[in-house]
Amino acid sequence: DGKITVLHLDSSTGAVDAITDEVFHRGLGSIAERSYRPHISCVKMTRDNKYLCAADLGIDYVNIYRLDHDRGVLRQVDIIRCDIDSAPRHLKFSEDGRFLYIVSEMKNCIDVYEYHEEDNVPFFDLIQTIPTSDKFEYKGVAASALNISFDGRYIITSTAGDNCVSLFEINQKTG
C-alpha cells in the first residue's frame, strides 16, 4: 500500500506507543496490469538521521521526507524520479552515508546517487547505473534484494527469474 506510518516509541521501554503521522502516496504507475498504484516497498533514514527516503515501486518515485524528531511528523522535501517502469524496490546507504544505492525491480539495475545537504536542502545526484543481470531480455526477471557487505566493500543483489546473485565492489571514494 502507499502509506507511511510514523510511530512513537516509549523512551524508557522501547515499546510502540502512538501513531504520530501517516503519509499517503498518490499517483498512478505506468504498468496497468502490475504497478498501477502507490506501493511503498522500502523506507530508510539517511545516515545523518535527517531524512526518510521512501521507495515506491508503484509510481517509480523515491520520496524524501524531513523528519521532525520531536513531533514525529514527516514533511516532503524532495522526490527522486526514477525511470518510468523501473519499480524502485530497495534502498541502502553507504556506511559513511555519502551514497544511496537503489535497486529497481523492473529495470534490473542499481542506481547510485551521491547524497549531500546544502542549507538544509537534501541533494541526490545520479552518478552511475549498474545492470544486475547480463540478460538483455528482462521478461520474467526481477531484481529482488539489495544489501551491503558487513565490511562495506561490496553491494550484493539478487535477481529472481534468472536466479542469480551479483556482487559488486564499491569504490570507497566515488561510490
Predicted feature residues:
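Surface-exposed loop and turn segments in beta-propeller and other repeat-based domains
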Residues: 20-35, 79, 126-138
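Short coil/turn segments that connect the beta-strands within blades of beta-propeller domains
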Residues: 48-50, 96-98, 151-153
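Loop/turn-rich, solvent-exposed surfaces of beta-rich toroidal or solenoidal domains
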Residues: 141-174
